[in-house]
Regions:
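M16 family metallopeptidases and their MPP-like homologs
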Residues: 1, 45-56, 81-192
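An aromatic/glycine/proline-enriched structural segment found at the starts
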Residues: 1-56
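A generic secondary-structure signal for well-formed alpha-helical elements
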Residues: 9-17, 75, 88, 132-136
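Short beta-strand/turn micro-motifs at beta-sheet edges
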Residues: 35-39, 96-102, 197-198
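Active/ligand-binding-proximal structured segments within catalytic/core domains
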Residues: 46, 50, 59-73, 79-82
Length: 203
């Protein structure tokens, strides 16, 4: 009925080309340690970016990544911000997240950042790499993280204007339905051991 109404009331070109959107470019990260320097004489601080290649992600890893990110490096209460800025004053800003692929069968990767004074750059990098190599374990933070993630699902519901586009994207990504249902189940059942396992397998 909708299709008939659209054809009747809108003038559409019958020779429309099929869209290839969205275009997702394959990550091309180095398979060995590589350092790039960009010298800007006007820069007032060091901007440090950290990229670590990952591998194809299973659905369970994708779901767990959000909890890992909240624990490790997403937000002011995460390890990276607390250890780098709050406890050691080595950076103005700092974060680190495991970036999931747009498609379910894609490759993930770790993406980190620090903005710091030039004279603190080396110490900041050493501290950041220390967190990556030996993640501190603070399981008591889990309840607060889980509660916050469950609350975030309430505000992530698409509104009526974007519902059709969002549902289409879910299908294109490879989901059978609303992924928030999967995330809800994951948040309710996840424990700190899952976060540690994710860290050990992906970093």
């Amino acid at each position: 009925e909708v299709k008939t109404s659209v054809k009747k009331n809108l003038i559409l070109n019958n020779q429309l080309k099929k869209s290839n959107s969205p275009i997702v470019y394959k990550q091309k990260l180095k398979d060995k340690n590589t350092i790039y320097f960009y010298n800007d004489k006007k820069a007032v601080q060091s901007q440090i970016h950290v990229l670590i290649p990952g591998s194809n992600m299973e659905l369970d890893e994708r779901l767990t990544s959000r909890t890992f990110n909240k624990y490790f490096g997403s937000g002011m209460s995460a390890l990276v911000f607390q250890e780098i800025r709050e406890f050691r004053s080595l950076a103005y800003s700092a974060y680190g997240v495991y970036q999931v692929p747009w498609y379910l069968d894609g490759e993930g990767y770790f993406r980190g950042y620090m903005g710091t004074q030039t004279d603190k750059t080396v110490n900041a990098i050493e501290a950041y790499l220390g967190l990556l190599r030996n993640m501190p374990e603070k399981p008591l933070r889990m309840e607060g993280i889980k509660s916050g993630l469950l609350q975030s699902l309430v505000t992530s519901k698409p509104n009526f204007r974007s519902l059709a586009r969002t549902a289409r994207n879910w299908k294109l990504q490879g989901y059978d339905g609303n992924p928030n249902v999967l995330y809800k189940d994951n948040y309710e059942s996840i424990d700190f051991k899952n976060v540690v396992n994710f860290y050990e397998e992906n970093l």
